[in-house]
Amino acid sequence: MLGKLAYRNTKRNIKDYLIYLITVTASFSLIFAFNLVANSDEIVKLCSSMDAFKNSLFAVNILIIFVICFLINYTTKFMFEKRSKELGTYMLLGIKKKEIAYLVVIENILLGILAIVLAIPIGFLFSQFVSLVIVNLLGIPKTLFISLNFVSIGLLIIYFLTIYVLVLLNLLRRISKMTIRDFLYFDKQNEKKMFRDSKKRNVIFVLSIILGVISLFLWNSRCTMDNFNKQETLTYLMVSVIMLIISIYGISTTCADMFLTVLLKNKKMKYQNDNLFVARTFASKARTMSFTFGTLSMLILISLLALNYSSINKASYDISVNLNAPYDVQLFDDKQVFDEYIRVIEEEYTIDNTIEYDIYKEPNHQVQNFFQSEYYDFDPVLKLSDYNRLLELRKMPLLSLNDNEYYIVTNSKFAYEVEDNKDIETITVANKNLKLKGYDTKSYWNSITNTGRFVVVLPDKYVQGLEVSENHLIIDTKEDTDAELENKIKEDMQHQLVKVDENGEINDESYRVNVRGAEIEQQKAMVAIVVSLFMYIAFILISAVGTILAVQSLSDSTKYKYRYLTLRRLGINDKSLFKTIRKQLLILFCVPAISAILCSFVMMSSLNNVYQQILGDKHLYLMYFGLNLIIFFLIYSIYWIATYIGFKRNINEES
């Protein structure tokens, strides 16, 4: 009996919660698609670094589970609210509360099963698209077919059970505490209004604004090249985020009353068209769902940050490769074994050119003082002739120095230590004063020297008599290198790279060897992982926000139908009525997005202080922010349009 009733009710209510069903189905489809890709042997074989994809996905899925739990729990509450009188009537007819609880649970499980049944074929199709994106990001000219596997299906079922067990336990707990009266009047309840005193509300609103501004200033103060790499920066950023969260919730709990107060004080605006009705409707809703608005703003903020971070990560790909491995093969070791390295490489590759260069010690460490001198007590020096040979191999402009000049090559992250630094405008080498001609960051790479974050380029005659610190070998091959070459070098030269000290401890010095092909593969894999996972997170979060607002609005279209029927009886035609509804929904959807968009823009502008040194363009982030904002509004507007259509349908049905 209960089963038939649950099936009938589920079939009847699917139309009202179609948006919710679509979002849950899409969420499970994405989870299943990414699990299929992560557990695919074909994807893992593409790149050794793709093993990290599975571990990263597991961590992301934990976040997604909480978001879907929040979504389903919130929607279940509204489904329960809409049918509370019906359930209360069942109790009046003598049906036990326990049986009513089972009825509601069965209905929710049926909806969930429908979602997961639809999710498997949709997720399978979507996994082919995800694999295509990953293959393109990896730059591999082939198409992969992702096959179904029981591990991914099993994980999907585990996630499904975890989510629904948590949601349904919470629902059963709520039902167990309710009486017949609670059931009959449950649809009259809302979130409690947090502030009834206008003075207290105004103080909270102003303090929240101030706290938000302070948090963003704190965030900006740490996002500089000077501070970003300091150990305490993470603590400051966490404090800033906590303050921002408090600020967003504070603004969300007070903005509705502030909005209404401003409107009521402006008589011209107050009585213009439908402004008063829209403002009153929004305020009555926002006052009772202020905490929800805060949560939705946080979800939008996270989604925008995820979209922008994935874009910046993709843009920094070429720069990261050149920063770690600008040459086909680069290594530093004893000169005596360079020929052995060359023989290993020649077994499979044709060598076009080799460059040997030395790093020398300048004992006065006049520049090192500004680059954390506690690590080394000398300045690493490179001969001008060697530097020009390196530049020539990379097809970069050559450098010329007079006898009284020197040059600095450093990481872009530390350019601020050199720029406008009067203390290093002149240094003394071999009892002669040398003036700083300039500095360069484009020709720098991380293993140009192992003894610092910069090198001093001197005319050749000044390195005579200086102690040699390191011996480096650069190899240019005719063919493009790959990760297998790096593995081969490390395996064949293990006797040189892996050493045992006097205490019997093994020291693996494989970091001495860098192969460009391996670095390209690793960076492409990292870009593929970051871009796909962060887009996945953003889509789920935006969909969750859109669904909650849609369900909330559609519930109101039924709950407060008398408002719109009254407007019709007062002579408002359908065109004007639907315009009012559009305006009402537009405000409802925009309010949680405004603060999130502003905060995300300020935070990305601050992070750009760091990333512009890497990207080489201080305005590039604006283009990415604009494009990602378009993506956000495209997804968000789909929910707004669907909500508007459903709202109109409910109003017309009631009429």
Task: List the predicted regions and their residue ranges.
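Long, hydrophobic alpha-helical segments
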Residues: 59-74, 543-546
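Peri-transmembrane interface segments
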Residues: 15-21, 33-63, 78-81, 89, ...
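Selective transmembrane-helix segments that form parts of the transport pathway or gating/packing helices
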Residues: 14-20, 104-122, 161, 196-205, ...
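Alpha-helical transmembrane segments
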Residues: 29-59, 133, 218, 222-225, ...
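Nucleotide-cofactor and metal-assisted catalytic machinery
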Residues: 320-528
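Small-residue-rich transmembrane alpha-helices
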Residues: 28-40, 74-78, 111-140, 152-177, ...
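Feature of multi-pass inner-membrane transport and sensor proteins
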Residues: 1-18, 82-86, 96, 131-152, ...
